[in-house]
Amino acid sequence: MTITDLVLILFIAALLAYALYDQFIMPRRNGPTLLSIALLRRGRVDSVIFVGLVAILIYNNVTSHGAQMTTWLLSALALMGFYIFWIRTPRIIFKQRGFFFANVWIEYNRIKEMNLSEDGVLVMQLEQRRLLIRVRNIDNLEKIYKLLIENQ
């Protein structure tokens, strides 16, 4: 096993750990989930570049008769990238005392002001940061509003 294979295993393990945390552990942290809303995906250009580069590496490894283990590891990395970038849906998860947005826990008392833009983006101003929440279904903004009013 080469250093390349070890690095690939490390990256695959990191992506797998992130996927498991995002899918199974995060919804169970900090109490029961009150509301989970699907968000719009960000630009997919980065993901296309990543998966495309891994596909080029697979092609290069196969045509130069590289190690079969490396080909399998590159394929696993491409599949993990495909899952994380295209199959997994980003979500905002509301709990009793706060919410998870982009895998970061934010307590409700940190929200200084909220606005709704004309194009349906909920803007939450924190102490030093502004969150732009783009929901997939515009009707979910009303659910978020009701939940925040109940918990404030």
Swiss-Prot record:
Principal cellular location given in the protein's record: membrane
Keywords recorded for this protein, A-Z: Cell inner membrane, Cell membrane, Membrane, Transmembrane, Transmembrane helix
Protein localization: Cell inner membrane
One Pfam family per UniProt: DUF986
Membrane protein topology class: Multi-pass membrane protein
Stored InterPro entries: DUF986
One Gene Ontology term, aspect cellular component: plasma membrane
Bilayer-crossing regions: 6-26, 45-65, 67-87
HAMAP family: UPF0266
Source organism of the structure: Salmonella enteritidis PT4 (strain P125109)
Protein name stated in the entry: UPF0266 membrane protein YobD
Family per similarity comment: Belongs to the UPF0266 family.
